[in-house]
Amino acid sequence: MHKNNLPKYFLFVDKYEKNILKNDITNLGIIYRNYSKKQNESDIYRLRSYCNKKKFKFYISNNLKLAVKFKTDGIYIPSFNKRITFNKVNLNKNFKIIGSAHNQIEIKKKLDQGCEAIFLSPLFKIAKNRKYLGVCKFKLLTLKYEKKFIALGGIRKKNINTLGMLNIYGMAGITYLKKNRPKNLGRFL
């Protein structure tokens, strides 16, 4: 197994696809989150194998039992999960807890849940949500805490270079990372 440092790039997927990426990104974490239907364990197994082969980190969203069963690199706690707290004594020492937040209250909750990195979103305007943080609010929120923040939401080619102005550890996406090569990702990291 590879070193268990947090990746700089994260990709959200809801199912296994043979060619998840059309590029050669390294330092990538894949987060399996499927909220629309029952968790497909064969998809999880294939994603775990794919990540091992490509030396990517693999995380499961919101299901500690599956994360332990499939020996993932960690768990992703979505912003709507306000109650889970973990006892890391029972987990592998390299097991990472990461989570997402949309505001200061949710950031504090993720800190209480023991998250090592927090996905702060949406940074830019996205189709499904009229509210977004914008560069100024995002930067103010991240400067308050000594934590690794990952930008998420609305990241596109036209605004990728804006990430260089932010206090971030990395970036995450659902579609942008699938299509763009690392050289097109800007110099923000």
Language model features with spans:
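N-terminal amphipathic alpha-helix/helix-capping segment at the start of soluble metabolic enzymes
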Residues: 1-19, 189
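Hydrophobic faces of well-ordered beta-strands that scaffold small-molecule active sites
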Residues: 7-13, 28-32, 58-60, 75-77, ...
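Short, acidic/polar
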Residues: 11-24, 62-65, 102-109, 156-162
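N-terminal active-site wall of soluble small-molecule enzyme domains
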Residues: 18-19, 29-90
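Conserved, mostly hydrophobic/aromatic
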Residues: 30, 67, 110, 118, ...
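Alpha-helix-loop-beta-strand connector modules within alpha/beta enzyme cores
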Residues: 43-59, 82, 87-103, 131-156, ...
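Glycine-rich phosphate-binding active-site loops on the catalytic face of alpha/beta enzymes
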Residues: 75-86, 117-132, 155-189
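Internal catalytic-core helix/loop-beta-alpha segment
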Residues: 94-127
